[in-house]
Amino acid sequence: MYEAARVTDPIDHTSALAGFLVGAVLGIALIAAVAFATFTCGFGVALLAGMMAGIGAQALLSIGESIGKMFSSQSGNIITGSPDVYVNSLSAAYATLSGVACSKHNPIPLVAQGSTNIFINGRPAARKDDKITCGATIGDGSHDTFFHGGTQTYLPVDDEVPPWLRTATDWAFTLAGLVGGLGGLLKASGGLSRAVLPCAAKFIGGYVLGEAFGRYVAGPAINKAIGGLFGNPIDVTTGRKILLAESETDYVIPSPLPVAIKRFYSSGIDYAGTLGRGWVLPWEIRLHARDGRLWYTDAQGRESGFPMLRAGQAAFSEADQRYLTRTPDGRYILHDLGERYYDFGQYDPESGRIAWVRRVEDQAGQWYQFERDSRGRVTEILTCGGLRAVLDYETVFGRLGTVTLVHEDERRLAVTYGYDENGQLASVTDANGAVVRQFAYTNGLMTSHMNALGFTSSYVWSKIEGEPRVVETHTSEGENWTFEYDVAGRQTRVRHADGRTAHWRFDAQSQIVEYTDLDGAFYRIKYDAVGMPVMLMLPGDRTVMFEYDDAGRIIAETDPLGRTTRTRYDGNSLRPVEVVGPDGGAWRVEYDQQGRVVSNQDSLGRENRYEYPKALTALPSAHFDALGGRKTLEWNSLGKLVGYTDCSGKTTRTSFDAFGRICSRENALGQRITYDVRPTGEPRRVTYPDGSSETFEYDAAGTLVRYIGLGGRVQELLRNARGQLIEAVDPAGRRVQYRYDVEGRLRELQQDHARYTFTYSAGGRLLTETRPDGILRRFEYGEAGELLGLDIVGAPDPHATGNRSVRTIRFERDRMGVLKVQRTPTEVTRYQHDKGDRLVKVERVPTPSGIALGIVPDAVEFEYDKGGRLVAEHGSNGSVIYTLDELDNVVSLGLPHDQTLQMLRYGSGHVHQIRFGDQVVADFERDDLHREVSRTQGRLTQRSGYDPLGRKVWQSAGIDPEMLGRGSGQLWRNYGYDGAGDLIETSDSLRGSTRFSYDPAGRLISRANPLDRKFEEFAWDAAGNLLDDAQRKSRGYVEGNRLLMWQDLRFEYDPFGNLATKRRGANQTQRFTYDGQDRLITVHTQDVRGVVETRFAYDPLGRRIAKTDTAFDLRGMKLRAETKRFVWEGLRLVQEVRETGVSSYVYSPDAPYSPVARADTVMAEALAATVIDSAKRAARIFHFHTDPVGAPQEVTDEAGEVAWAGQYAAWGKVEATNRGVTAARTDQPLRFAGQYADDSTGLHYNTFRFYDPDVGRFINQDPIGLNGGANVYHYAPNPVGWVDPWGLAGSYALGPYQISAPQLPAYNGQTVGTFYYVNDAGGLESKVFSSGGPTPYPNYANAGHVEGQSALFMRDNGISEGLVFHNNPEGTCGFCVNMTETLLPENAKMTVVPPEGAIPVKRGATGETKVFTGNSNSPKSPTKGGC
């Protein structure tokens, strides 16, 4: 403020006047709302409430004015100054005499303020921020000359808000209270008229009620049961054909406040807009006067009546949650609780004309406006981002023909509209030139619409009770429905040709009050006086209650268990300031005067803060996490994130073209990815820093049909008219085929000789699944659609004549559908949850059949802090205690036997040191992308190097860090990749060179190591079964994906697909026994030396907690017995306990299943039994040297000596140890990621299954079925690039650029998903989220599911695009469909891919790929971020 002012320096006028008007609008609305609510309570109460509101309104005036004063624009310059005193060669300015040229005022205003103790030519020196007599301020000054002293006003300064306006507005506040009360009186007699029909989209995602209902009701059921929409869709209450604008979006003009060009259609609209009769565009909302009222026509063509308003008055529609205000200068402004302001300009209701919307703004001042011709048609759309759209009209009917984006001299066609001979919209052509929609009409009524792929929905009309109504619909796929209307009885029935019937009842306002679904499920809805649902009675004896405030906002929501969540809001908005859950946990948020989040707190009091630039924007410039870490964000004029700097000062930059399409992304190392995109934004080619690229081809609907990956590998996808996948062809030409019924439900999936078939209930739920080996799975559901039973009918035995084996599993759930009891033939498992639905205890009790198998009772308990974070888990082998920092990072892990692991972190959680007790395990160094480049390993140091694609290309360990590099050091390993990104060669200091080759689909076909003189060859059948020879002779040894023969091995299976017998030549036989959940219980191994019986025990979550080996000689004499016990950290083995000692495992902080070290300690009992010196009492630490997928290759001790080294066969069997070094000095059972080798069985325990390294596949079927892939025994295409740590579904692990569609595990009701995003390295990185368990966002009600957590992760980390693969066979639930777009940052995009063959069965599940985009009304993240 002390910068010296000079001639030519700018003067600025603030937006105080504009801000004052916003404050006035808010204040009038506030008083009017209070008066509405209190008028009937008596004049005294109304007066008191009005006085209180007046206090608030006057405060709003001040807030509005201060909002405006935050922002300024240049309005002129200083034009006169000192004749002989210069600053930076410019005349110095001084008060009382220096004049300015102001564009807003005449004659020449003077500088009014100046320094109290520095004078120029006897006059006070002027500085930056000193006032001008017209109310402006000096906007800039010298960068190196400063005039200090206080500030004194020497001349009068005009107020930027005129006194007359202050007086008028004060009067308006008083009048607003009176008129508000009258409005409340008039409301009962029709003074304020509700729309004749309810909002057609009121209950879908993105709308408050849709979001609330989506927590309890499936998305399709919300539309049908509550919204009254059926089919594609039809409004069953009126028989009108509608098309929701949410599914008819043609283009979004990028801007800080984006402009969506989307169409709404209703056959009930007689008005012919610029697209023809029945169609409405967003800019066709309007006001007009009729019958003594002001009628507002919204974007669905619905009319709502407001009373006539005088200047300074406002009215509020509770049903539609909108305010209409007439400002003192005669302008009409409509605004909603979403804080969008619609300016209709100055309007005289007596004129008879229409007042069209002319400008739209949000609370932050971001805007777009419409320029119109003399006919009221929009000719241009201007945006605050600088892009404009030009609208051209065809000449025959004057309809809208094209919308073209314009930036300076560059033009881009966004959408083209075509018309039939009657001027009705007939086609929509997108920016790519593809015809994406076609329509046909008869007598002005829509009779069909077709998508880009030819899927057609057709309609038959009949006049009933004087109105045209749809009486029949059919599709090009053969689906057919008929509609029966009882207008007088207010009910409608819809029938299918097979006899299924749905039935609705509705009230006089066309609100659904009862609905019976196709499967008999019954719904009932009760409403309050303004049409807001207050009670929702659902199938399964479930009731949901809602309470509202006077603005129609949900303030209390009580679920079917009687648990209530309460919400408070900020002002007259939908912004929550406090959400208190049923468990008492509270989330709070604070906003600034523009409605932007400035801070939030969770139940633990952890605070996140946001900073914003001094500009009209809702986009934050900085985010401070709960530890004070600062991340900065830079945005371009279109609202695109162009710079993200983490709290370590590392920056990622993204560039966009003038039309908002991504061009490139550059990481902190300067590595750049470039994008060639289609006009609609999808990538055509992505080129990586090394010059390699991927290309994408799309059909007319914009869905991917051909993908050419790295190395030129081609995948092709064939789709039906619905866009559903009907054939997938991999790069090797193998095909997976899909067949659907007329309603789009998957009926058959075939991969070569392997075939799955499916049947469904009347309500569309999956009833049966038949697998390739003949196993039949039958599903049973409750009234609420929850799964209650599963019958598994074993595969038919061609040699047996009796009935097939049947296994029955039963589920008991509470009224929220949460699993409480699971009953299997061998055990009963009970689940306990707290009020936040967090799992607190799982208890197992064996049945008599289970006791016979040796299963014993067991329990696991969990503890959480006030923030809902998991802090402890207790099991039969001890407790694991988590100490978390403010960002939810584990900083200490307490283990049984008094052991502790500590992680020292920097930034938002990057680990730089790991300690075991007082001993340092490893110190880490990282590069600018936070990747590990160095770690200590006792006396050794290991360094790593990466290629431009982020893949590890070398690692080297040795005593002298300075001597480490590619091919040097004590232990070194180099990696080579082919053009497709597959690992083709490893060379290391112990094993020499090992080469790998692959088929075109990336499946391993050979492995060769000249040093070992071993060459392995493999082949694959079309169903993904690994065969043991390249000539495919063993093809006949696979039936129904069950492997029967492999070299000298022979396999037999039980009826449920579990390996029952394995024979190795004539000398070894193994027999396997399983429990009621197909978990391996015993292995009986007999060979020429005798018998080994191996028995396994599991906790109630299915984690192996004990293994006992008992050896017998050939006479049956017991030789020895050994038991090992296991402790788990979540789903990761953390401790192995033997009679004499404990081994604790430490994993990489960057690769969760790649071991870093093992700490071996002697048990206390052994210490007490023998004399051991103090040096041996400390842990003995061994260090792992792993390959890129985390498989241990060597183990060294603290002195740097090799204690173990393994020689692997292709599929993970260690055939020799310590080649080229001394004898092994320690056992090392870890193998591929998540695997533990059992010497007694030859199998690898793989968390939820056992893996057989002899044949490279699992011994039983995937617990998650098709979610893990079409072949339920399959491990991975190749074991050197893929991992499957849970034994459920493989995922690609070599580099950040290729991604698979891994399907992750569901257990105990959890949905697990992997979120992929572009990291600071410019590559794809992954993060696993799960529902039903610990989450990084435990205190945000909308982040319980994978999609919500991914969306918040995107927001908190400045990520503009992400991809989610999840395991839920029910697809994306209605809650996530409804909420994710609200959670996403503005303009961000997230694609959610369900498991293969996902089928909706409950809670809004949708088994299709969903694309979510963020909107500008979404609340800012209430959670932490990461660097």
UniProtKB/Swiss-Prot annotation:
Identification of the protein by name:
Double-stranded DNA deaminase toxin A
Domain of life, per UniProt, equals: Bacteria
Instruction: Name the job this protein performs.
Output: Toxic component of a toxin-immunity protein module, which functions as a cellular contact-dependent growth inhibition (CDI) system. CDI modules allow bacteria to communicate with and inhibit the growth of closely related neighboring bacteria in a contact-dependent fashion. Bacteria that have this module inhibit or kill bacteria without it, giving them a growth advantage. Probably specifically inhibited by cognate immunity protein DddI. The C-terminal 163 residue fragment has double-stranded DNA cytidine deaminase activity; it does not deaminate ssDNA, ssRNA or dsRNA.
The domain section of the record reads:
The toxic domain is at the C-terminus (residues 1264-1427); expression of this domain in E.coli reduces viability nearly 1000-fold.
User: What EC identifiers does the entry list?
Assistant: 3.5.4.-
Q: Where are the YD repeats?
A: 469-501, 548-584, 720-747, 977-1008
Q: How does it sit in the membrane?
A: Multi-pass membrane protein
The scientific name of the source species is Burkholderia cenocepacia (strain H111)
Q: Which UniProt keywords apply?
A: Hydrolase, Membrane, Metal-binding, Repeat, Toxin, Transmembrane, Transmembrane helix, Zinc
Q: Where is the composition biased (Polar residues)?
A: 1412-1421
Print the organism lineage.
Answer: Bacteria, Pseudomonadati, Pseudomonadota, Betaproteobacteria, Burkholderiales
Q: Give the Pfam families listed for this entry.
A: DddA-like, DUF6531, PAAR_motif, RHS, RHS_repeat
C-terminal effector domain, has cytidine deaminase activity: region residues: 1264-1427
Where does the protein principally reside? membrane
Q: Which reaction does it catalyse?
A: a 2'-deoxycytidine in double-stranded DNA + H2O + H(+) = a 2'-deoxyuridine in double-stranded DNA + NH4(+)
- According to its UniProt record, which protein family does this protein belong to? Belongs to the RHS/WapA nuclease family.
Task: List residues traversing the bilayer.
Answer: 16-36, 43-63
GO cellular component terms, semicolon-separated = membrane
InterPro entries hit by this protein: DddA-like, DUF6531, PAAR_motif, RHS, Rhs_assc_core, RHS_repeat, T6SS_VgrG/RHS, YD
